[in-house]
C-alpha cells in the first residue's frame, strides 16, 4: 500500500485538477454554444431552426469518443488546426487539452440546448403573445421574458448535464490528456494486485466532485423554481 501511495500520491491531485479544468472550460463553452443553438432552434427563421435541429440530432447520436477523436485526428492531424503555439515547450499537452475541450463543447452543447428547450416549453405561450402585442420582437421577447424563465426551469437537467460532463472528461485520455482516468490506467498497469483499491480511490475522487455539485444544483433549483 505504501508503494502504491508513493507512486500515486504526488500525481493524484494534479490529475484531478486537469479533470476540473476540463469540466469548467467545457461547461462554460457548452452553455454559450448551447444557448446559441437553443435560440436558433426556436427562431422564426426556418433555415436557423433546420440547421440547429440537424446539428443537435446528429451530434447527440454520435459517440463522444468519436467527437473527441475527430477534433484530434480530423481537425489537428488532417486539417492542421492548432489551438496552442507550436513554439511552446508544452505545445502537445496544451493542444490536446484544448482539442478535448472543443470536443466536449461540441457534444455537451447539444444536451444543454435540449435542456433549455425543455425549460422554454414550461413557459406559457401566452407570455410570448402578450410581448408581441406590446410590440416586442423575437429577440427582445426571448432575451427578456422567455429565456430567464427557461433557465430557472432547466436547472435540474442542466445540472445532470454538468455531472455527466464531469464523468465524460475521462474520454480525454484517448488523445493523451493527463486527467484522472489516464493516471488510473497507468497506476493499474503498475499495481495490478491493487486493482480494487485503485478503483476505489478514483471512484471516491469523482464522487467528491459530483455529489456536492448535484446537491448544490438541487438546492438552487428549489430556490429558483418557477412558481405556477
UniProtKB/Swiss-Prot annotation:
* Taxonomic lineage from the root: Bacteria, Bacillati, Actinomycetota, Actinomycetes, Mycobacteriales
Q: Which domain of life is it from?
A: Bacteria
Example of a GO MF term: transmembrane transporter activity
This protein's species is Corynebacterium glutamicum (strain ATCC 13032 / DSM 20300 / JCM 1318 / BCRC 11384 / CCUG 27702 / LMG 3730 / NBRC 12168 / NCIMB 10025 / NRRL B-2784 / 534)
The gene name on file is: gluC
Please give the GO cellular component terms listed in this UniProt entry.
ATP-binding cassette (ABC) transporter complex
Q: Which InterPro entries match?
A: AA_ABC_transptr_permease_3TM, ArtM/GltK/GlnP/TcyL/YhdX-like, MetI-like, MetI-like_sf
CDD domains listed in its UniProt record: TM_PBP2
> What is the protein named?
Glutamate transport system permease protein GluC
**What subcellular compartments does it reside in?**
Cell membrane
Per UniProt, the keywords (alphabetical) are: Amino-acid transport, Cell membrane, Membrane, Transmembrane, Transmembrane helix, Transport
Q: What is its main location?
A: membrane
- The UniProt record lists the ABC transmembrane type-1 domain at 16-217
Amino acid at each position: 500500500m505504501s508503494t502504491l501511495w508513493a507512486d500515486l500520491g504526488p500525481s493524484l491531485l494534479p490529475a484531478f485538477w486537469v479533470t476540473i479544468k476540463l469540466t469548467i472550460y467545457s461547461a462554460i463553452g457548452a452553455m454559450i454554444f448551447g444557448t446559441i443553438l437553443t435560440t436558433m432552434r426556436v427562431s422564426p427563421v426556418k433555415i436557423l431552426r433546420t440547421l440547429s435541429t440537424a446539428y443537435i440530432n446528429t451530434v447527440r447520436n454520435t459517440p463522444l469518443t468519436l467527437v473527441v477523436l475527430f477534433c484530434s485526428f480530423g481537425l489537428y492531424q488532417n486539417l492542421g488546426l492548432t489551438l496552442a503555439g507550436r513554439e511552446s515547450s508544452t505545445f502537445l499537452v496544451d493542444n490536446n487539452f484544448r482539442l478535448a475541450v472543443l470536443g466536449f463543447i461540441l457534444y455537451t452543447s447539444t444536451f444543454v440546448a435540449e435542456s433549455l428547450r425543455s425549460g422554454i416549453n414550461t413557459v406559457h405561450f401566452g407570455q410570448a403573445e402578450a410581448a408581441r402585442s406590446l410590440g416586442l420582437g423575437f429577440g427582445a421577447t426571448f432575451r427578456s421574458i422567455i429565456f430567464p424563465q427557461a433557465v430557472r426551469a432547466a436547472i435540474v437537467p442542466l445540472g445532470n448535464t454538468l455531472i455527466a460532463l464531469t464523468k465524460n472528461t475521462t474520454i480525454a485520455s484517448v488523445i493523451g490528456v493527463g486527467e484522472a482516468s489516464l493516471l488510473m490506467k497507468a497506476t493499474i498497469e503498475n499495481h495490478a494486485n491493487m486493482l480494487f483499491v485503485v478503483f476505489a480511490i478514483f471512484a471516491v475522487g469523482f464522487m467528491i466532485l459530483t455529489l456536492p455539485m448535484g446537491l448544490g444544483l438541487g438546492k438552487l433549483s428549489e430556490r429558483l423554481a418557477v412558481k405556477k
